[in-house]
Amino acid sequence: MAIPGIIDQKERIVLKSHALGIENYSLRFLEQALEIPVYFENDANAAMLAEKKQKYPNAIYLSLNHTLGGAFCIDGKLFRGQNQKAGEFGHMILVPSGRKCYCGKLGCADAYCAASVLTQDNRQSLDAFMEKIESGDEKILQIWDEYLDHLAVLISNLRMAYDMDIILGGDVGGVLSDYMIPLGEKVMAYNGFEHDVSYLKNCSYKKEASAVGAAKYFFTKHMGEL
């Protein structure tokens, strides 16, 4: 199962999930209820696992869903960090003293780059938002341009910090393929060391990447144990 939050796989505990509003929450009851082994993974980590590690042995995955998550692989393996918090890019401060994030802090990247930024004020689906972009709605075009600006800053910072390919995934990542040129131009404006954005990649799965990655990982794990 893929869950938005920091997961202790060994102990089957959600250490922290702002999205679900839980902390130190045991998941072992599911194993007891279902009477079968149940495995858990952070949703962004699972989405990263859906990508081919041979193609992206060293890469960052930006999960641009209702909330912003992230993950990254080194030498084809997920890097989880000392406390399972590696890849929490959504809670890096992007704009000091900026918008309030759902975690309670001000200026988090999530408050500027999550898919909810495009839908919450307009009370519409992402598909409807993108249709208005295509129709030339000036207000929506302005929101989209500001969104790409903030996303470009985040991407540039991650590229400078990690020097890896960056895979754009999640709901927004699934629609970005037609907007890579304007996004790339914005990214290059913030990065004085590179003259192209060939490191920006579209995700392999536009929908349900976390489900694919979770299934792929644990199927491979069990096949190796047979």
What are the language-model segments listed below?
Residues 8-9, 16, 22-24, 91-94, ...:
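Generic structural "secondary-structure junction" signal
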Residues 26-29, 34-134:
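Glycine/GP-enriched mid-protein hinge/lid loop-to-helix segment characteristic of carbohydrate kinases
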Residues 17, 91-92, 167, 199:
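Sparse recognition of residues in long alpha-helices and their boundaries
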Residues 33-36, 55, 100, 105, ...:
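ATP-binding/phosphotransfer module of carbohydrate and carboxylate kinases, centering on a glycine-rich
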Residues 5-58, 178-190:
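Glycine-rich phosphate-binding loop and adjoining helix at the ATP-binding site
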Residues 4-6, 66-67, 172-173:
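Short glycine-rich anion-binding loops that position phosphate/pyrophosphate groups of nucleotides
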